[in-house]
Regions:
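Transmembrane-helix boundary motif in ABC transporter permease subunits
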Residues: 66-96
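C-terminal transmembrane helix and the adjacent membrane-cytosol boundary/short C-terminal tail
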Residues: 86, 143, 220-251
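Short helix-to-coil transition segments within interhelical loops
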Residues: 142-148, 152-172, 212
């Protein structure tokens, strides 16, 4: 057994045990419209594969990617502003924190009312959820740069631009990747919430439609697909992080 398999073995054992308990519990309840078994969910996912993969998954991914891209631009911009000026930090930080006290399920219907059932109401929900961890984590990364190193470069005639790109950016990269790994699942959740509350397509919308039909397995099938997509995306980002930040210890 190689090292990777040994490292993942505890997680696989825990997951298998959880699924077995779920299977036995659902069989005991014997009410698939309330608690379907994992086997029933996988069967439903296979039955619905065509409509889920060709219609609803692309719709959800479009909202997720657009929302995450906007959150990245917004979060990075706010983090840099707060790092460069104490005035901007005092002005922006409380607003950023306050934005996370707004219940998503309360504001999402307003976005639908203002922007309709198109993509932008769901994108705004996604941005509202995801820009916060990006902003705060990247800001902490920028603040983690050692002042002594910056002062040393200044004595050699370095500009603020040099310090930013040669010290702050390398120090921030691990924080940036951590922010991305947090933001990906949150962006998918945001897209699903937006679709659940008001949409004409998407995995969140499809799950809600199955709920109205008392199809428990149909409700869970899109959720399983969303979870799989999120785990795959986070794994890819982690792989990219290992390649990009492997020189970190030498810096």
């Amino acid at each position: 057994m190689n090292k990777a398999c040994r490292g993942n073995l505890p997680a696989l054992i825990f997951l298998f045990s959880l699924l077995m308990l779920w299977q036995l519990g659902a069989m005991k309840v014997d009410a698939a419209y309330i608690l379907p078994t994992p086997v029933q969910i996988l069967q439903k996912l296979w039955e619905l594969r065509s409509v889920l993969f060709t219609v609803h998954l692309p719709a959800t991914m479009l909202v997720t990617v657009v929302g995450l891209a906007i959150s990245l631009v917004l979060g990075l911009g706010l983090a840099v502003l707060m790092d460069t000026s104490s005035f901007f930090h005092k002005a922006i930080y409380p607003v950023v924190v306050a934005s996370q006290t707004i219940p998503t399920t309360a504001i999402a219907p307003l976005f639908v009312l203002w922007f309709g059932y198109g993509i932008w109401s769901k994108v705004l929900v996604t941005v509202l959820i995801t820009f916060f961890p990006i902003t705060i984590t990247v800001y902490d990364g920028l603040q983690s740069a050692k002042v002594e190193m910056a002062e040393l470069l200044l004595t050699y005639g370095a500009t603020k631009r040099d310090i930013f790109f040669k010290i702050k950016v390398p120090c921030t990269l691990p924080y940036f990747f951590s922010a991305i790994k947090m933001a990906i699942p949150m962006s998918i959740i945001g897209a699903a919430i937006g679709e659940w509350l008001g949409a004409q397509s998407g995995l969140g919308y499809f799950s809600r439609r199955m709920m109205t039909q008392l199809d428990g397995a149909g409700v869970f099938a899109p959720i399983v697909l969303l979870s799989a997509v999120a785990m795959l995306a986070v794994a890819l980002v982690a792989l990219l992080e290992k390649r990009v930040v492997r020189w970190r210890g030498e810096f």
